[in-house]
Amino acid sequence: MKEIIAIIRPSKMAQTKTVLEGLGFPAMTANRVLGRGKQKAIVGELGFEVDNKELLNQPGDMRYIPKTMLTLIVPDEDASLVVEAIMKVNKSGQYGDGKIFVCPIEDIITVRTSERGEAAI
């Protein structure tokens, strides 16, 4: 099993979710996050309200910008399909398109049923 963590533009969340659901991957966790990459923030990128305005207005070159972080757990054989789908929706060729991390998962347990492994996905 693989954990896929994708950090994407908030404006691409709905389309990414629709594509993943269409491929049979409706289960995911989404979080609003702040961060920055090599581009040192893109002005006007705000996709949601930020409670702590100080994070957006740091002195100097470093500004944090809102992103959406998706987390999915998929069988090993589906990881490439999911990564390619996320890339297809989110790749514009511009700074800020995001990052995707693929990590191994040792086990999953559903608390309610005690199912383990891929049966728990």
UniProtKB/Swiss-Prot annotation:
Q: Which GO terms describe its cellular component?
A: cytosol
Which GO biological process entries does UniProt record here?
nitrogen fixation; regulation of nitrogen utilization
| Job of this protein | Could be involved in the regulation of nitrogen fixation.
Phylogenetic lineage: Archaea, Methanobacteriati, Methanobacteriota, Methanomada group, Methanococci
Q: What is this protein called?
A: Nitrogen fixation nifHD region glnB-like protein 2
Q: Which organism is it from?
A: Methanococcus maripaludis (strain DSM 14266 / JCM 13030 / NBRC 101832 / S2 / LL)
The record's section on PROSITE patterns has:
PII_GLNB_CTER (PS00638), PII_GLNB_DOM (PS51343)
Q: Does the keyword Transcription regulation apply?
A: yes
Determine the domain of life of the protein's source: Archaea
PANTHER family from the xrefs?
Answer: NITROGEN REGULATORY PROTEIN P-II (PTHR30115), NITROGEN REGULATORY PROTEIN P-II HOMOLOG (PTHR30115:SF11)
Q: In this record, what's one Pfam family? A: P-II
Q: Has keyword Transmembrane helix?
A: no
Give UniProt keywords alphabetically: Nitrogen fixation, Transcription, Transcription regulation
Q: Which Gene3D superfamilies match?
A: 3.30.70.120
Provide any one GO MF term from the record.
enzyme regulator activity
UniProt lists the family membership as follows: Belongs to the P(II) protein family.
InterPro entries attached to this UniProt entry: N-reg_PII, N-reg_PII-like_a/b, N-reg_PII/ATP_PRibTrfase_C, N-reg_PII_CS
